[in-house]
Amino acid sequence: MDKTQSRLRRARQTRIKIAELQVARLAVHRTNTHIYAQVFSPCGTKVLASASTLEAEVRAQLADKSGKGGNVAAATLIGKRIAEKAKAAGIESVAFDRSGFRYHGRVKALAEAAREAGLKF
């Protein structure tokens, strides 16, 4: 089993457990150059809020710093944005789905920023 298959296996198990809880899910996906966050409905079929480093506003803010979306500063910004959007959609608490990625670096920065912005998980 290679690295990608192991990550996907971990993600699948996490999503099964979160589905049993029937709560909104904050899913994170990261690539080498970008990071994405989405809040899914408790049934898992609708996206209620989303944020990523591909958004024009985010890219403009990141252009001042490093111009890239693949760093901790970008992940922190996305964490704040997803928390604001989720709260605007009426969601106060979520289950954190790290999609099989280690809770370290950019994933950790996004989670901590979302918590600081008022999202509970």
From Swiss-Prot:
A single BP term in Gene Ontology: translation
Domain of life: Bacteria
Gene Ontology cellular-component terms listed: cytosolic large ribosomal subunit
Family: Belongs to the universal ribosomal protein uL18 family.
Assembly notes: Part of the 50S ribosomal subunit; part of the 5S rRNA/L5/L18/L25 subcomplex. Contacts the 5S and 23S rRNAs.
Function field: This is one of the proteins that bind and probably mediate the attachment of the 5S RNA into the large ribosomal subunit, where it forms part of the central protuberance.
Name of this protein: Large ribosomal subunit protein uL18
